[in-house]
A protein has these predicted regions:
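Two-component system phosphorelay core
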Residues: 1-124
Length: 124
């Protein structure tokens, strides 16, 4: 396991901002995190498939969807990484796409682990 897989939720999510967005509704926060756990891997797989197929337009669209989801959940670093990936796909820069994918996937792995621990009650 990498250090990112042991990182706390606060390293990935601006919790004060997110709690304000949901009006401190812990039930809504739990629902949003559950949706994230369900949707994020599907979108990441779709992104991987689009990149492997050379469908950069689809990769750009999927990266854009990931960026929006992450930004709405106050996951700013992940949203920035998705934005970098979106820009690389738009530019058609294969080398940058690969670098951006590696950075995004590493961050997303740690983020999903942190959300999982949070959901399991493993941290506040």
């Amino acid at each position: 396991m990498t250090n990112s897989e042991h990182a706390s939720i606060e390293q990935y999510v601006n919790m004060p901002e997110l709690l304000a967005r949901v009006d401190n509704d812990s039930e809504l926060l739990t629902e949003l995190f559950a949706l994230f756990q369900e949707d994020s891997p599907k979108l990441r797989d779709a992104l991987d498939n689009a990149v492997r197929a050379g469908d950069l337009r689809q990769a750009e669209k999927t990266a854009h969807a990931l960026k929006g989801m992450l930004a709405n959940l106050s996951m700013k670093h992940g949203a920035t990484l998705a934005a970098n990936l979106e820009a690389a796909a738009r530019a058609g820069d294969e080398g940058e796409i690969q670098r951006a994918m590696a950075a995004f996937n590493a961050d997303e792995t740690g983020l999903l682990a942190a959300v999982g621990r949070f959901m399991a009650g493993g941290e506040p």
